[in-house]
Amino acid sequence: MACSCLLMASMQTLPGPGAFRTENGTLYLAFQEYYEAPQDPHNMADALSQTLSNSSLSQTLLSQTLISHTFLSQTLLSNSSLSHSLTLSQNSQTLLSQTLLSQTLLSLLSLTLSHSLKTLSNSFFSLKLFSLKLLDVFSLSHTRTSTREDGGDGQDGHEDRVWDVKWSPTGAVLASSSGDQTVRLWTREARDWVCLSTLEGPQKGTIRSLSWGREGNYLAAASFDSTTCVWEKGPSGFECFATLEGHENEVKGVAFSASGDYIATWFADEEEFDCAAILAEHSQDVKAVAWHPTRDLLASCSYDNTIRFYRADPDNADWICCDTLSDNQSTVWKICFNADGSRLAAVGDDRTLRVYQAFPPGNPQGAALPAHSSIYAPCLRNTLHSAINRLVCSDFAGIVTPSASDDKWKCIATITGQHTRPIYSVDWDPETNILATAGGDNIVRLFRETAVQPDTNTPSYELIGQFQAHDQDLNGLAWAPNQPDLQHRLLATCADDGLHVGNHKS
């Protein structure tokens, strides 16, 4: 089978097939109509290794072009001398990790073949954005793993502590992840919860975090074995169609964007490739991220006590940090947006719940109705691009949320004195706006907004309920979406002692 492939750093014409050279610290390679002959990979590896050993590389650039499976697996990944040579450089800006090269083809594809030209980051604590479209193009996983169908007796629970729970977009299925290295899908039949299927894929470590794609056709699972598995819904159940590899340490979390085009993962690696983007603003470990519910705005929180917001730069499509919140005095463990994206809730080590709201530039104190240069609502996307002089409202149901890319976020409410230990999780009910928090004191607490001061637009919150769902630390919680009954709300919680789904009266 013929494979045409080109790796380059300029538009300069390169030598023929199998040629290698360096110029000004940059490596140039050319492979055109490379045929998968058994002896060729070793010859190419020797030639490339010799070239690298006589050169000092300050920058190695890789293009979008798909690389031959055979070349990668036999030449790059199996040749130890080549792997060693690729780790050599006179500076630390661009290094190809020997560890990465010793892993599978999937690792190199997922890390190097992004939609734009990328290099390694020297940051220790970073976020990574994968493009779901790239996963389809490059077919990162060539081995599909199907689900195992379990019985419907509701007894197919996890065999280890449950780390995360996430509802599907429709609210019909609840996914849970565990230290038993499985993901389980649950649904309600009458008054019982039944395990629909158990997803046992290639991951060999605790599955720490889950995230559903926009329509529920994809489910991403992040594991302590340094991989992220993306499951795709098929006719016979969910299948693992992509495995994102290459992290040197555990993947702490994963989150789909609202558009479904991006997957964010966070971890603490020593050196990382940039995929769609590396967001290296935090100075310490990233604990959680949250995508804005209607646009590609990403928020992250960290051990460095800050919350940061990122968006794509419209001029060059690079992802930039557009705002930083530094009013937390300790680790921020979890963040979440409300249903329309106008507010963000944050909890952390200081046992405090904080609520932030977005305000336009020039309005640091807030106002009853912040005036923006654009209006954002699902039915009004990309419609207004200049200043608003007049606003006319119709009587159709729904909420129109003023929004702008250069909004600044301000803390408008601080709730303290409720939890007695660190708060690890928070979630906003999309229908009732009730905030649920949980943490190390084993107690779930529910908060509701009671009043808004018209001069500053700052709300007050009151505790409306609390209960103990577990006997050990709570790791996560999630409200079920799309519940027509506003009086009875489903809330899933997970802890070291298992999974619990409760029906709570609002």
From Swiss-Prot:
What keywords is this UniProt entry annotated with?
Repeat, WD repeat
- UniProt-listed InterPro entries: CIAO1/Cia1, WD40/YVTN_repeat-like_dom_sf, WD40_repeat_dom_sf, WD40_rpt
SUPFAM superfamilies from the xrefs? WD40 repeat-like
Q: What residue spans do the WD repeats cover? A: 157-196, 202-241, 246-281, 282-320, 327-366, 418-457, 469-506
Q: Which GO terms describe its cellular component?
A: cytosolic [4Fe-4S] assembly targeting complex
Q: Which GO terms describe its biological process?
A: iron-sulfur cluster assembly
A Pfam family:
WD40
> Which PROSITE patterns does the record match to this protein?
WD_REPEATS_2 (PS50082), WD_REPEATS_REGION (PS50294)
The record's annotation in CDD domains points to:
WD40
| Alphabetized HAMAP family for the sequence | ciao1 (MF_03037)
Q: Which family does it belong to?
A: Belongs to the WD repeat CIA1 family.
Query: Record's PANTHER family?
Result: CYTOSOLIC IRON-SULFUR PROTEIN ASSEMBLY PROTEIN CIAO1-RELATED, WD40 PROTEIN CIAO1
- Its biological function? Essential component of the cytosolic iron-sulfur (Fe/S) protein assembly machinery. Required for the maturation of extramitochondrial Fe/S proteins.
This one is known as Probable cytosolic iron-sulfur protein assembly protein CIAO1 homolog
Q: Which organism is it from?
A: Monosiga brevicollis (Choanoflagellate)
